Curated annotation (Swiss-Prot):
Protein name as annotated: DNA repair and recombination protein RadA
Binding site for ATP: 105-112
Keyword Ribosomal protein among UniProt keywords: no
Biological processes annotated in GO: DNA recombination; DNA repair
CDD domains found in the cross-reference section: archRadA
Amino acid sequence: MADVLTELPGVGPSTAEKLIEAGYLDFMKIATSTIGELTDIEGISEKAAAKMIMAARDLCDLGFKSGVELLRQRQSVWRLSTGSKELDTVLAGGLESQSVTEFAGMYGSGKTQIMHQSCVNLQIAGKIYADLEGVVEEELENPKAVYIDTEGTFRPERVVQMAEGLGIDGQLVLDNTFVARAYNSDMQMLFAEKIEDLIKSGNNIKLVIIDSLTSTFRNEFTGRGKLAERQQKLGRHMATLNKLADLYNCIVLVTNQVAAKPDAFFGVAEQAIGGHVVGHAATFRFFLRKSKGDKRVAKLYDSPHLPDSEAVFRITEKGIMD
């Protein structure tokens, strides 16, 4: 691996080892990095970092693409069922890869339940997708999920319960789900950055979950004086998640807390935390709210190509369903 990186200008065996230790295992990771990120590595100057990045981009053939090429790339997008056909219809078939989907809402609105259900559904992605579309899809090869838990709400027993509700082995789902408990924003960001290491070591990571996205940031950066610092750090975290979705054709799901809108006289009285940073970085944005009994309402209010729409789903012992 070190021999490959030495093809870059100014990279000898010693520098190559430092790059590998920092997680830069291939040209693509270097090509999509910033000068500031590379200069954090001891012994790499801004000038050397700039040369490495430019050379890596040339080797990866990064640049403009035609609309036809992008359309071809979009054909590799796959979808994962939420468990609710009505909600899947709003999403034109299910949760989409190469994108970040946000579910925001008050406590008890179903955010974490959707995250748990997604881990289960990943193990039968091909089967569920075939049921929805009426066509036979090639099943994912031993897909795995990463669940970064920032609020201590991941429950393996709930995953098993949902799996049994679909007639599959709950132990299989747990075996294929990597869970990390993040107690602060630095841990949260580090775990997200380490996902590439899991992929490089042979794990077919196809689902990444952050539950929840903003809780650690809210706890650490209090007051308006720290808002700019919080947003910059959150922006870097979202960039990491988007890069994972794009480079590895995986689905990224994030839950988000809400805050009251004091100026809201009509309509939704809460707004998702994170402001424009999260708003611009998330591909699909949902707002969840409680309804009667076990019913929940999911409103899609931001998407690059789908209309605003609502779906009603239920949270039962067996999991998410219509």
